Curated annotation (Swiss-Prot):
GO terms for cellular component: host cell nucleus; T=7 icosahedral viral capsid. It comes from Odocoileus virginianus papillomavirus 1 (DPV). It is found in: Virion; Host nucleus. Self-assembles into homopentamers. The capsid has an icosahedral symmetry and consists of 72 capsomers, with each capsomer being a pentamer of L1. Interacts with the minor capsid protein L2; this interaction is necessary for viral genome encapsidation. Interacts with protein E2; this interaction enhances E2-dependent replication and transcription activation. Belongs to the papillomaviridae L1 protein family. GO terms for biological process: endocytosis involved in viral entry into host cell; virion attachment to host cell. This is Major capsid protein L1. Keywords: Capsid protein, Disulfide bond, Host nucleus, Host-virus interaction, Late protein, T=7 icosahedral capsid protein, Viral attachment to host cell, Viral penetration into host cytoplasm, Virion, Virus endocytosis by host, Virus entry into host cell. Its main location: virion. Forms an icosahedral capsid with a T=7 symmetry and a 50 nm diameter. The capsid is composed of 72 pentamers linked to each other by disulfide bonds and associated with L2 proteins. Binds to heparan sulfate proteoglycans on cell surface of basal layer keratinocytes to provide initial virion attachment. This binding mediates a conformational change in the virus capsid that facilitates efficient infection. The virion enters the host cell via endocytosis. During virus trafficking, L1 protein dissociates from the viral DNA and the genomic DNA is released to the host nucleus. One of its GO terms (molecular function) is structural molecule activity. The keyword Disulfide bond applies.
């Protein structure tokens, strides 16, 4: 082993890094493109987490500050009716999908969303000059509303996106904190599921554990866990399955500065200020927090209702939809308008206005539509490829019915001929085990596209976008030497005939320029 030893120090070579194969190294493209899209997907419900029971049914919580996570099921291309049966050899390779383009469309008008609390923990207005206070009352909570942090998030992968949040940590046994002291906190990770709350300007935390007053936050998140996408972990993921790409826009500014009620147990040191004269002890709080605001909502900065083309994913997986699954994670509170519904509380005709005769409800509605451009690819079953897939995602080989460990032949089993005959023992009442869903314990919006793929790109808006530019792009296409992208994908696009190749390259390069 080579080493360098200056003086008494010994320096060994660094530990080699385990290399992960890029999907471009073992994926062979077939130059066949399919289009798939969903119907108009609608949802409506109450903006709060309160369960309202009507005739043994529950009105779901539908808030603009929730994530929408779509789990898209694609057909198995190995059982697909292909236009050419000689495209692949089933004994030596398997077919997979690679996502080339995606468009997440949203309906409904833009509107700022307003959240608040009927009993908000605000003691003093700290942004303006406040009077001196010698004591706090028992309860001086106030009604407060605000337009929260504005954000749009779009993430695409073949596994669920990962979110992070802070929560209470288990204290050390030898150093258990006293009652009323600040607990230790830790960062935890979890899959972002459909219906999880976004950060709206108050941080990503488990407010079920950290909001004991139930008055420090808007009602929307007062008893929820707010997740923030863990971009650091997903970009460093070796396989690159959780996030092919992401787009986001966040904006927030401080609208008000308040101080909360409560006993401040972490007072600033006396060396930082001079005490007031006399024996009177002032109770001016030293804890401040901001009321966020998302400001203007405009169509100029919308991430949705436009196509995204994947020429090079950020990770080692360049858009391959393993297990024929895609996860689309959407967060958007720019369409946060709520419908205020008033109904009379009885059947009597109304002749004059009386507030006591009306019931007031609020509903929030959302509208989505997904569209994809998929390319047919094949994976050659070489030892290197099988070993790499077994290490990164073993479920791929299980779904392909590839067993790396042959069954043991030394065990003698009994097989009865007439197993259904009364003269033979009862057959084992054990049904064949079905493949387990690794995400069965998680909540997603299930989308089935197994019977909705089409080769006729010109019959769909996203497909026509690829085909509509016919004779205007020759002089606009950039040269390969000026850009960095996978060699296989470049050669693939050079083999695609006609305008499909032209438009894919043009749109991808224009997004990167």
């Amino acid at each position: 082993m080579a080493f360098w030893q200056p003086g008494q120090a010994l320096y060994l070579p660094p530990t080699p890094v385990t290399k992960v194969l890029c999907s471009e190294q073992y994926i062979n493209v077939r130059d066949i493109f399919y289009h798939g899209e969903t119907e108009r997907m609608l949802t409506s419900g109450s903006i709060l987490s309160l369960e309202v029971t009507q005739k043994h049914t529950t009105v779901p919580k539908v808030s603009p500050n929730q994530y929408r996570v779509f789990r898209v099921a694609l057909p198995d291309p190995n059982q697909f009716a292909l236009p050419d049966k000689a495209l692949h050899n089933p004994s030596k390779e398997r077919l997979v999908w690679a996502v080339v383009g995606v468009q997440v469309s949203r309906g409904q008008p833009l509107g700022g969303e307003v959240r608040g609390h009927s009993y908000f923990n605000t003691f003093l207005d700290a942004e303006n000059v406040s009077k001196k206070v010698t004591a706090q009352g028992t309860d001086d909570r106030k009604q407060a509303g605000m337009d929260t942090k504005q954000q749009q998030v779009l993430m695409l992968g073949c596994t669920p996106a990962i979110g992070e949040y802070w929560t209470k940590a288990r204290p050390c046994v030898t150093d258990r904190p006293d009652a009323g002291s600040c607990p230790p906190i830790e960062l935890k990770l979890s899959f972002i599921e459909d219906g999880d709350m976004m950060d709206i300007g108050f941080g990503a935390a488990n407010f079920k554990e950290l909001n004991a007053t139930k008055s420090d936050l808007p009602l929307d998140i007062a008893n929820s866990i707010c997740l923030y996408p863990d971009y650091l972990k997903m970009t460093e993921e070796a396989a690159g399955n959780s996030m092919f790409f992401f787009a986001r826009k966040e904006q927030v500014y401080v609208r008000h500065i308040w101080t909360p009620w409560g006993t401040d147990k972490e007072l600033p040191p006396e060396a930082y200020y001079l005490k007031p004269p006399g024996e009177m002890e002032l109770k001016m709080p030293s804890v401040f927090f901001a009321s966020p605001s998302g400001s203007l909502v405009s169509t100029d900065g919308q991430l949705f209702n436009r196509p995204y083309w994947i020429l090079r994913a950020q990770g080692m997986n360049n858009g391959v939809c393993w297990n024929n699954t895609l996860f689309v994670t959407v967060g958007d509170n720019t369409r946060g308008s709520t419908l205020t519904i008033t109904v009379p509380n009885n059947d009597e005709p109304l002749t004059e206005y009386d507030t006591s005769k009306f019931n007031v409800y609020q509903r929030h509605v959302e509208e989505f539509k997904l569209a994809f451009i998929l390319e047919l690819c094949s994976v050659e079953l070489t030892p290197e490829t099988v070993s790499s897939l077994q290490g990164s995602m073993p479920s791929i080989l299980e779904n392909w019915e590839i067993n790396l460990q042959p069954p043991t032949s030394s065990v003698l089993e009994d097989i009865y001929r007439f197993i259904d005959s009364p003269a033979t023992k009862c057959a084992d009442n054990v049904s064949p085990s079905k493949p387990e869903d690794p995400y069965s314990a998680h909540k997603f919006w299930e989308v089935n596209l197994k019977e909705k793929l089409s080769l006729d790109l010109d019959q769909f808006p996203l497909g026509r976008l690829v085909l509509q530019f016919d004779c205007r792009l020759d002089r606009l296409l950039p040269q390969k030497d000026h850009f960095t992208y996978p060699e296989k994908r470049y050669k693939r696009h050079m083999r695609i005939t006609g305008t499909v190749r032209k438009v894919l390259l043009y749109i991808c390069f224009s997004l990167n320029s």
